[in-house]
Amino acid sequence: MWQKWTLMKYLISLVFLTFGATIAMAEDRLTAAVAAIDADVVFMRHALAPGVGDPADFTLENCNTQRNLDSVGRQQAAQIGAEIRRSKTRFSEVLSSEWCRCKETTELLGLRQWSTFSGLNSFFQDFAEKSDVIEMLQQKLNNLNPGVTLMVSHQVVIRAATGQSVASGELVAFNTRSKETYKFSLD
């Protein structure tokens, strides 16, 4: 009788441990997406910035001449950042387009140090030369640091690199070797 009770307690504990681990993994959508395709890059489109494109008087150095995040976009970026920080995935490098909406998104994620990279800049309205952006991005993708790199960019750049169209705040895990993609969201 005692052996049956011990065995039953063991089996019940095993079920709860397995169930708990499954729930924890299901809630860590970032790690699940990266693991699903052995991704070495995660692209993220900047958080919500209402409108399309940028004003005609756009200048890279002046955020007042650009389409920027609104309060909903700021909240979205902060929520996504909280999910990333809760995740088991740690980024070896975090890069952002030089556009203000991408830099603000990256800052609001609340991650460690990050830097801008012109190979992530938008070529939607020809404020950046598409061929130059794609060439810089491809060189970077061919020479990544070990680990997983986060790249905060624009819909046109992410689509050019991965073939995936993304909404504001959406992410695409990308395996640079196999070219596999896995689109997901964290908000």
Regions from the language model: what does each represent?
Residues 22-26:
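Sec/Tat signal peptide C-region and signal peptidase I cleavage site
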Residues 39-42, 147-153:
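Generic beta-sheet signal
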Residues 87-89, 143-147:
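Glycine-rich phosphate-binding loop signature in dinucleotide/nucleotide-binding domains
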Residues 117-123, 127-134, 138-141:
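All-alpha RGS (Regulator of G-protein Signaling) helical domain and cognate RGS-like helical scaffolds
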Residues 27-126, 164-187:
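Active-site-proximal alpha-helix that buttresses catalytic centers in soluble enzyme cores
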Residues 10-20:
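Sec-dependent N-terminal signal peptides
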Residues 1-11:
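Positively charged n-region of N-terminal signal peptides that target proteins for export
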